């Protein structure tokens, strides 16, 4: 299948309702083992589960990886996978692919008063 934005968006929409877990138990179920300890199937996939940080970056990376395969996802994400949103943003800037006008399927970043701190898909 082609590298269309619809593919990654469809995968992300399929994950709506997924709630983070209190431990590594039942990671593939959307609403079992609910807790605020940052355990998710997305973090497990990348081997960085339970970080005391948001998991939005791992989620977007996972969606791209599922949609396009590991190596193609890395290329589309401008370098590599990261659990830290400022690092992911730097990948785009380094490759001169940063834009303030997102298109459908783009990884988008949100900034608080200090730094980029969250992200998602357009």
Regions flagged by a language model, labelled:
Residues 1-70:
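N-terminal capping segments
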Residues 2-3, 70-122:
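...with weaker cross-activation on analogous glycine-rich loops/strands in unrelated enzymes
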């Amino acid at each position: 299948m082609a590298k269309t934005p619809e593919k990654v968006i469809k995968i992300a929409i399929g994950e709506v309702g997924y709630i983070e877990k209190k431990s590594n138990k039942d990671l593939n179920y959307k609403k079992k083992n609910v807790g605020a300890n940052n355990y998710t199937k997305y973090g497990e996939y990348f081997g960085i589960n339970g970080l005391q940080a948001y998991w939005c970056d791992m989620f977007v990376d996972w969606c791209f990886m599922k949609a396009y395969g590991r190596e193609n996802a890395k290329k589309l994400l401008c370098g590599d996978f990261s659990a830290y949103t400022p690092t992911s943003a730097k990948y785009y800037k380094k490759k001169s692919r940063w834009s303030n006008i997102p298109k459908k399927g783009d990884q988008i970043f949100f900034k608080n008063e200090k730094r980029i701190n969250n992200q998602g898909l357009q």
